[in-house]
Curated annotation (Swiss-Prot):
Gene3D superfamilies: Large-conductance mechanosensitive channel, MscL, domain 1 (1.10.1200.120). GO terms for cellular component: plasma membrane. Homopentamer. Channel that opens in response to stretch forces in the membrane lipid bilayer. May participate in the regulation of osmotic pressure changes within the cell. It is a multi-pass membrane protein. It holds the Pfam family MscL. This is Large-conductance mechanosensitive channel. The keyword Kinase does not apply. SUPFAM superfamilies: Gated mechanosensitive channel. One of its GO terms (molecular function) is mechanosensitive monoatomic ion channel activity.
Length: 148
């Protein structure tokens, strides 16, 4: 099999396509969460703390010298990233929890036995007839008082 055919067989498998869709949706979801944290959560939080902009929080390790920029330890951006992660992890947890609940409900649902087909019913009747025919006949008893 050529490499192209093998790749095509691999790429169109359900799991690979599902994974690709999940990665694309996950990347888009990550951007939404980052915007939510940076634009919606952090500004009010910074205002409550005293007008602090978290993205500007940093410790200067070495000040700028000439054309060389300052070396900063930007812990404010790290705090935003941690909050991003917590929100994404919580959203994933809630999604997995919902899926697990649906699986449990699906497992609890009683499944009805399949109805036999006409052929299966006919085969069952033939089996029963063959069993009846293979039984030995009941012995004949003669009552001497009723003899002619």
């Amino acid at each position: 099999m050529s490499v192209l055919k093998e790749f095509k067989a691999f790429a169109v498998k359900g799991n690979v396509v599902d994974m690709a869709v999940g990665i694309i949706i996950g990347a888009a979801f990550g951007k939404i969460v980052s915007s939510f944290v940076g634009d919606v959560i952090m500004p009010p939080l910074g205002l409550l703390i005293g007008g602090v902009d978290f993205s500007d929080l940093a410790v200067t390790l070495r000040p700028a010298q000439g054309t060389a920029p300052a070396v900063l330890l930007a812990y404010g951006k790290f705090i935003q990233t941690v909050i991003d992660f917590i929100i994404v992890a919580f959203a994933i947890f809630m999604g997995v929890k919902a899926i697990n609940r649906l699986k449990r409900e699906e497992a609890k649902a009683p499944t009805l036995p399949p109805t036999p087909s006409k052929q299966e019913i006919l085969l069952g009747e033939i089996r029963d007839l063959l069993k009846e025919q293979s039984k030995p006949a009941a012995p004949i008893t003669v009552d001497p008082a009723r003899t002619l």
